[in-house]
């Protein structure tokens, strides 16, 4: 089977079907969160939320993009403009590899607690 990067298949998912993971090592200070909000307000979502799909629960669990997800939850204007939908790129990996993916995605951003 030929490998195809997940970014070539971005889907729109209702924010209510997206959940944070339990192992996010990335912390963002309030000033940076405000900058992220300002960026999303001005430019829209330019990067998808990276998730894996939990078929049993019918939800998407965040690998990367937790703070972009938080912006949608915390700012009504963004939620309404985007109609409650977030762009999602899905990867399928076992739990131990998902944790490694989260760390790789976050390595260049924020402070890490690992």
Give, region by region, the residue ranges found by the protein language model.
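N-terminal leader/domain-start detector
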Residues: 1-15, 38-39
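Amphipathic, charge-rich alpha-helical segments that serve as recognition/docking helices
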Residues: 3, 19-47, 57, 69-114
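Short beta-strand micro-motifs enriched in acidic
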Residues: 52-54
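Short, conserved phosphate/pyrophosphate- and ester-handling motifs at nucleotide-, phospho-/glycolipid
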Residues: 65
